[in-house]
Amino acid sequence: MDLGVAAILGVVQGISEWLPISSKTQIMLVSIWLLNASPEYAYSLGLFLEAASVLAALIYFRGVYLKALRGFVGDAEGRRWLVYILVTTLVTAVVGLPLYYVARKWLVVGHSAGFLMIVLGLAVVLNAVFLQRARFSAGLKAFDNMSLRDMAIVGIAQAVSVLPGLSRSGATVTALLLLGYKPEEAFRASFVLVPVAGLGATALAYLSEGGAVATAEALLAMAIGIVISIITIKALLEFAKSKHVVLVNVVIGLLAIAGGLLRIIF
């Protein structure tokens, strides 16, 4: 891998991780096209580069993680974040670990995952239509009132996204929007989960490839991915904070559909 390819991989990772398009799939495509890598190695490289997203999230949402730590000593808001992270992580681990090994062995599931992303995207667009007709955006849920059931659903959505072609942020943001949460709450609650899921993915990729993915060029791609990720997070959260709830749903839905189509075509 030369420095140019490393830079491209970093930019792709930094943008695609936070959009409803699978960063793993985009990294796989770039790696196969530009590096002539095997699908198995390209898949592991995509998971390894999620470390860039992990570090970017830790930097951007450091205040949230500090609150979660204070939840251990009785801070009410911190406890809500702590419970959310623990519940979703537990569910993700239970459901996601078996799926990872299945996905790595049978990468043909990518096309099926692409169809699933299209279905999810259509569901979010349909949700936007309902929002527009009902005009109940003021009654959307806030994170403070999230139930254990909703947390578990988010964990399942995150676990399923280990399959090639499925976007982690796309799956979790979609789940939260369909559960009725405000767009800004959905984006933030989804992005906050990146470190836990990403660390697990990076560790699995490193171990399964015997450390072969941790090259100097891959580390450069990771560094570039961190910078691009922070810029992308800020832009998306600002967009989600806008009052155009219906527009946010439509855009997310259309991006999910586009991501699914890309996976099916390529």
Curated annotation (Swiss-Prot):
UniProt keyword Transmembrane, yes or no: yes
GO cellular component entries: plasma membrane
Listed GO biological process terms: peptidoglycan metabolic process
Subcellular location: Cell membrane
One Pfam family hit: BacA
Domain of life the protein comes from: Archaea
Membrane topology according to the record: Multi-pass membrane protein
Segments traversing the membrane: 41-61, 82-102, 106-126, 159-179, 191-211, 213-233, 246-266
Catalysed conversion reaction: di-trans,octa-cis-undecaprenyl diphosphate + H2O = di-trans,octa-cis-undecaprenyl phosphate + phosphate + H(+)
GO MF assignments: undecaprenyl-diphosphatase activity
Chief place where the protein resides: membrane
Keyword entries, A-Z: Cell membrane, Hydrolase, Membrane, Transmembrane, Transmembrane helix
The protein's Enzyme Commission number: 3.6.1.27
HAMAP family (UniProt xref): Undec_diphosphatase (MF_01006)
Function per UniProt: Catalyzes the dephosphorylation of undecaprenyl diphosphate (UPP).
Family, per entry: Belongs to the UppP family.
Protein name, as recorded: Undecaprenyl-diphosphatase
Species per Swiss-Prot/TrEMBL record: Pyrobaculum aerophilum (strain ATCC 51768 / DSM 7523 / JCM 9630 / CIP 104966 / NBRC 100827 / IM2)
